[in-house]
Amino acid sequence: MDKSGIDSLDHVTSDAVELANRSDNSSDSSLFKTQCIPYSPKGEKRNPIRKFVRTPESVHASDSSSDSSFEPIPLTIKAIFERFKNRKKRYKKKKKRRYQPTGRPRGRPEGRRNPIYSLIDKKKQFRSRGSGFPFLESENEKNAPWRKILTFEQAVARGFFNYIEKLKYEHHLKESLKQMNVGEDLENEDFDSRRYKFLDDDGSISPIEESTAEDEDATHLEDNECDIKLAGDSFIVSSEFPVRLSVYLEEEDITEEAALSKKRATKAKNTGQRGLKM
């Protein structure tokens, strides 16, 4: 708001105060005289648009006054957009960056790898089918399908791991036999035969020691050259069936024969009916 507007407001307020004082002094003499309400500039709501709008009175006052060097800029759409852009630029400057720039270049450096040669290498790797198998050449199959190659490779890997397992087992067995002072047996026997042989096959299998009485009986038997012993027939099961079981078996045979005869009769009836229909 310019200086002329402020002077006019001060003049209006001073006039209102003088009228109020006069009305207070003359209220005792005249009761019918009306009083003037003082003007209160604070109570009114100021319109913000009036700051930028220039009235003809204010223009005349600004021309007449020598102190009023500042003139308000009219509100336009262009000014609003420029103000918004300036605010946006200030906000960007104040905004902190999450990652501080290091100054290093991004991406793959140029001249390190030729994309044409990389594509050629990829095609060669895709077309190459690994090492060839000699038994396929006998079958006149130079380029085997991918499924066959996969099965052959799996079989080779399986055989390799089985052989490693066998060597590991042989190594552990040799160490255990050396600790038991039985290392001489490995020179005379094959490993595959020793693999399925127990270490205590030569000795007694049962840990219970036999009594001396049984040894004496064995010596007497050797002298007499008779190793046959008589035993009771209590453990022998008789092969004769009881009476009840035989009856049940006969009844089952009869029922099976009756069922077979019924089936034959029904089949004969069905065939006769079909012949009549035809």
Curated annotation (Swiss-Prot):
Chain positions with Phosphoserine modification: 23, 138, 234
Example GO BP: regulation of DNA-templated transcription
Biased composition (Polar residues): 22-33
Locations listed in the record: Nucleus
GO CC annotation, single: nucleolus
GO MF annotations, alphabetized: DNA binding; identical protein binding
Assigned keywords, A-Z: DNA-binding, Nucleus, Phosphoprotein, Transcription, Transcription regulation
Biased composition (Basic residues): 88-99
Major subcellular location class: nucleus
Record keyword Nucleotide-binding present: no
Segments of this protein annotated with the region Disordered: 20-71, 88-116
UniProt keyword Transport present: no
Function of the protein: Component of the transcription factor SL1/TIF-IB complex, which is involved in the assembly of the PIC (preinitiation complex) during RNA polymerase I-dependent transcription. The rate of PIC formation probably is primarily dependent on the rate of association of SL1/TIF-IB with the rDNA promoter. SL1/TIF-IB is involved in stabilization of nucleolar transcription factor 1/UBTF on rDNA. Formation of SL1/TIF-IB excludes the association of TBP with TFIID subunits.
Subunit structure: Component of the transcription factor SL1/TIF-IB complex, composed of TBP and at least TAF1A, TAF1B, TAF1C and TAF1D. Interacts with UBTF.
Name of the featured protein: TATA box-binding protein-associated factor RNA polymerase I subunit D
Gene source species: Homo sapiens (Human)
